[in-house]
Amino acid sequence: MLADVSSVDAIYIVCGRTDMRKSIDGLCAIIQDQFSMEIDHALFLFCGRKCDRIKAILKEPDGIVMIYKRLTAQGSYRWPRNKSEVRNLTW
């Protein structure tokens, strides 16, 4: 199933600005290099300089999915730029 988040155990917001030109491999490298984590059973969210678009990485049994969302209206995400701005997520 494409982008089935029912098996996700945790959601991680990657603080700061991410180069949104990065592909699946580039975003997976950030997860492994900066956080020493594997991508299994987690959803990782990234935001660039413009806070109107995000990317998500999710591993599924048959591959890795990258989800890209750009807001079409004049709006933006409130994205933490450093660890002091991080808040807990519930869903």
Language model features with spans:
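Polybasic/polar functional segments that serve as interface/processing modules
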Residues: 1-91
